[in-house]
């Protein structure tokens, strides 16, 4: 719960309950309304009642196979941040996370060796979201496993990165259950000692790609649109083109159309160079574009149809390989 800062109206958010509802919207057991208390040292003067939460966690843990807990303090903190200076925000953030840390420690002491604990980090703040840092962290603790590493699924086929659709499937798989209507995949473990450094580098790449994606797509659409429109106009009015430059104009437009075929190939093949920043990604795409263009011209010199066929076959092969690996 929190208060709308424009209207002052209290907002009751119960979206989290959707995760444990049955097909008719019913929650078998739990507390979705009376778990907060008034505390002026917390955002909006509202705090999770952690003493009550601990008691109810212990009670529901004893009689339930699956227990989900949503802590609203982190969400309220992000919503309330605009009202705070940096010093006050830091103090309030410490207070919030100190309580959460104490609660998580309590849960770990209570958990048995056959339990699995999922800790889903809070959704990215508004600032992080604006800066394309849009992934929420998930940590899975298998209480019987002392190793450490990263999670992966066949949905993304990328170590440390998976879809939110996979979480529900993985929880069901812990009970030996399957739901035919779920499209996610169970999560697997990959042992890795340097997981933190690895994920920091991978996340940097993900943010870089997200930040530059729309610019690349816009450039691609512009190249395709301009080349096809100009090409169509040139063919339509070819008799009116200056005879001295007619051949050069048509050849240039023809190469522009081929460039439209090459650019998607460059997007797909650029990761081979392992770029890690926006500048490196841009340079990798430009390099692969020129490389593929020169390769096609050298292999099938003066044969445009074979060049188009070559680029098309390469595209099909890359898509097939990407879907298999």
Residue positions per predicted region:
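Soluble extramembrane regions of membrane proteins in the secretory/endomembrane system
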Residues: 1-212
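Acidic, Ser/Thr-rich low-complexity intrinsically disordered segments
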Residues: 194-237
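Membrane-interface micro-motifs in multi-pass membrane enzymes
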Residues: 156-157, 161-162, 216-219, 277-287, ...
